[in-house]
Design a protein with these regions (language model features):
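Non-catalytic terminal/interface segments that mediate subunit docking, oligomerization
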Residues: 67, 251-358, 364-374, 471-473
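Cofactor-binding active-site loop characterized by glycine-rich and histidine/acidic residues
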Residues: 43-164, 300, 305, 314-315
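N-terminal amphipathic, basic-rich helices that act as targeting or association modules
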Residues: 1-81, 218, 222
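Glycine-rich ThDP/TPP pyrophosphate-binding loop and its adjacent helix/strand module
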Residues: 110-267, 273-279, 283-288, 408-517
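A short, small-residue-rich loop immediately preceding and capping a beta-strand
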Residues: 40-42, 66-69, 113, 136-151, ...
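A glycine-rich helix N-cap at a beta->alpha junction
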Residues: 89-98, 163-176, 370-382
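Glycine/charged-rich beta-loop-alpha catalytic/anionic-binding loops adjacent to active sites
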Residues: 31-38, 97-113, 135-141, 315-326, ...
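Peripheral docking tails and interdomain loops at the edges
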Residues: 274-276, 387-389, 400, 409, ...
Length: 584
């Protein structure tokens, strides 16, 4: 199956192959990609569409002397296979050795840990400047595409590349006419015009930035790519190589439905059936809420930086929403600032994306929304501890990032009714800015108060004595389990509290605990430093209550296993009870 691939142990082996062997290699690499992705999932369409280009890059250039910078790096699988990491694709037992993104800890051929869009050109300009200062002689190649050009940092990078870099810089624009969902904005209309004119259109954004430009329409033809890369190798000025590729090439389903197959869970290759159980979850709950809300309220509008599928909004849903749906492309800053303008204009914007991406818009949330007191609601997915675990995609920093912005209410629901109630309150009752963290895991039905009425007060789920457990968001379930364990082992019923509002220090409830409690335990599925529990500890600092905070350390964890990390951090019933015993 891997006759040619078995001979490839590094880039130098690629250079020894004939054109026919390179074409065979591309087919074998797609088989290796199938082997991995059908079993553990990952970024499908981007990698199937870029196989030939990355083979040609390693055939023409000489990594690691020549520097490859991958934008997002979600499309770097072929590069990894060619740089000594094929076992992570052809040997099932070694899948875990290889991350889904470039990682310098894995290989000298990976320069950066990257997982967010639009950074490659900026990073590459820095490498170029460092090379100029040291009189170096090597190629710097940035590979960008898949919608990344719509990000402001990419345009900033192009601006600097065209004006400040006076040496070799090769920017490969992988134009597959697609982002995570469809592309948006005038920039992509220009790319379309360039494609339709074989790169000859007089309207050329890259030339306007002062960059040289070459177009290659056969972006999945190895021979054509080798020739165009040879033309620009060792060039003495910044140059854009615009290649036209087919996202998902090699799998008809991925070509026909590029959005669904951008990223996939494990699947059956023959049928395309996904092998992870579906069913109702918080993504589908969010989708239902948005569609119902839009139908009833013509002032409601959804704004997203190219992440509609993070809340399940299909292309058909987006068409149905019509003018009440705005996709700004991968541009979080634009999404938040635009939403602030919308709020000022009298409508009700709901901004949706993954938690890890919203950190880019910290300034807009603080400066454009909160200082101005504008009514913007931000809905973040994958902020949970057991959500995305790649080091570049962690949502565990959401609490310390957003709970320390003045005049921003951060809500951490624990049930479906609480979640939808918080959406109702944030959109229709509250007049300021809110962040709502979409719960992770399964939808659980619990016998507790329905919805959320906006009362800035903790919910007492269980009244007890001696020990109070304050469990935030997704760690509410751990709080319930801990309360049962305390009662079983220590013989008394502890108090269990669902704080609901991560930015709230409920002084009345905390003061009441002083009457018959000795220990307060806080649980949060985020980083402790600057987070929720520290605020509780600070308020109770001059009391006789002992406060123990449990959460995550300020660490860039990478592909952790949740259960193992909880044990390592002492966030288990046994460990917490042993701590509590010391203060009773």
């Amino acid at each position: 199956m891997y006759e040619i691939l078995n001979r490839i142990n590094g880039p130098e082996d690629v250079k020894k192959l004939s054109l026919g062997e390179l074409e065979t290699l591309s087919a074998e690499i797609r088989e290796a990609l199938f082997n991995r992705l059908t079993k553990i999932g990952g970024h499908f369409g981007p990698n199937f569409g870029i196989v030939e280009a990355e083979i040609a890059m390693h055939y023409v250039f000489s990594s690691p002397k020549d520097k490859f910078v991958f934008d997002v790096s979600h499309q770097s699988y072929t590069h990894k296979i060619l740089t000594g990491r094929k076992a992570g694709y052809i040997d099932d037992a070694r899948f875990s050795e290889d991350s889904g993104y470039t990682n310098p800890a894995e290989s000298e051929h990976d320069l950066f840990n990257v997982g967010h869009t639009s950074t490659s050109i900026s990073l590459a300009t820095g490498l170029c400047k460092a090379r100029e200062l040291q009189n170096g002689k090597w190629n710097v190649i940035a590979l960008i595409g898949d919608g990344s050009l719509s990000g402001g940092e990419a345009l900033e990078g192009l601006n600097v590349a065209g004006s400040e870099i006076r040496s070799n810089l090769i920017i490969i624009v992988n134009d597959n006419q697609q982002s995570i969902s469809e592309t948006h904005g005038g920039l992509y209309k220009n790319l379309e015009e360039l494609r339709n004119s074989d790169g000859k259109s007089e309207h050329n954004i890259f030339k306007d930035f002062g960059l040289d430009y070459i177009y290659e329409k056969n972006g999945n033809d190895i021979g054509s790519l080798i020739e165009v890369f040879k033309k620009v190798k060792d060039i003495d000025r910044p140059t854009v190589v615009h290649i036209n590729t087919l996202k998902g090439k090699g799998y008809e389903r991925a070509v026909a439905d590029k959005e669904t197959w951008h990223w996939t869970v494990p699947f059956n290759r023959e049928t395309g059936e996904k092998l992870v159980a579906g069913g109702r979850n918080y993504v589908s709950v969010t989708r239902e809420y948005i569609l119902n809300k839009a139908e009833k309220d013509d002032k409601f509008v959804v704004v997203t930086p190219n992440m509609p599928m993070c809340v399940g909004l299909s292309p058909a849903d987006r068409v149905k929403l019509g003018e009440q749906f705005v996709d700004v492309g991968i541009a979080e800053e634009q999404a938040v600032a635009m939403a602030s303008g919308m709020a000022k204009g009298g409508v009700k914007p709901l901004v949706i994306t993954n938690a890890t991406f919203m950190q880019r818009a910290y300034d807009q949330i603080s400066h454009d929304v909160c200082i101005n007191g504008n009514h913007v609601t931000i809905l973040l997915n994958n902020s949970a501890f057991d959500g995305l675990t790649d080091v570049t995609h962690l949502g565990i920093f959401a609490l310390p990032i957003f709970t320390n912005i003045p005049d921003l209410t951060v809500l951490s629901p624990t049930t479906e009714k609480e979640f939808t109630g918080m959406l109702d309150w944030a959109l229709d009752v509250h007049t300021g800015a809110s962040v709502i963290l979409i719960p992770g895991g399964k939808i659980l039905n619990r016998p507790r108060a329905d919805g959320f009425d906006g009362a800035m007060k903790y919910e007492i789920e269980q009244s007890g004595e001696k020990v109070a457990i304050i469990a935030l968001g997704d760690f509410d379930q751990k709080g319930e389990s801990l309360a049962e364990a305390v009662e079983a082992e220590l013989g008394f019923k502890p108090t269990l509290i669902n704080p609901r509002v991560a930015t709230l220090v409920d002084k009345q409830t905390l003061d009441d605990l002083k009457k018959n409690h000795k220990v307060v335990v806080t649980l949060e599925d985020g980083v402790l430093s600057g987070g929720f529990g520290e605020k509780i500890a600070a308020y109770l600092g001059d009391s006789d209550l002992k406060v123990k905070n449990y959460g995550l350390n300020k660490v860039f964890y990478d592909r952790y296993k949740p259960a193992e990390l909880l044990k390592e951090l002492g966030i288990t019933n046994e460990s917490i009870i042993n701590d509590v015993k010391k203060y009773l």
